[in-house]
A protein has these predicted regions:
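HIT superfamily nucleotide-processing domains
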Residues: 1-121
Length: 121
């Protein structure tokens, strides 16, 4: 299903259900701003999804609507997860897909954190 990054937030998306505890996840981190869990279809040795707790469809929605404190808290959470996974020294990749052309599959902002191996160019 194509994701419209300008559409209203859909509370029935899978990440909203994970945030509400309705669907289990392999959680690796949680704070007041974000939750992080292992991707169920990993594309790298380490593939973690970092999801803000706020109701944001995409990076565009988040960057335009979230308060500065929430943006900072989420960005710091991404960094904390990378450090906890031991990814800083060997290196890692961050990815946020936005909309249909960007390959977004879930209408809730999330960052893919890839690592644990040499990643392609």
């Amino acid at each position: 299903m194509p994701i419209d990054p300008t559409a209203p937030y859909d509370d029935d998306n899978i990440f909203a259900k994970i945030l509400r505890g309705e669907i289990p996840s392999s959680k690796v981190y949680e704070d007041e701003w974000a939750i992080a869990f292992v991707d169920i279809n990993p594309q790298a040795e380490i593939h973690t999804l970092v999801v803000p707790k706020g109701r944001y469809v995409s990076w565009d929605d988040f960057s335009a609507q979230a308060p500065d404190e929430e943006i900072a808290g989420f960005v710091r959470a991404v960094g904390k997860v990378a450090r906890a996974k031991g990814l800083v020294e060997p290196g890692y990749r961050l990815l946020a897909n936005v909309g249909e052309n960007g390959g977004q599959e879930v209408p809730h902002l999330h960052i893919h954190l890839f690592g644990g191996q040499k990643l392609g160019r």
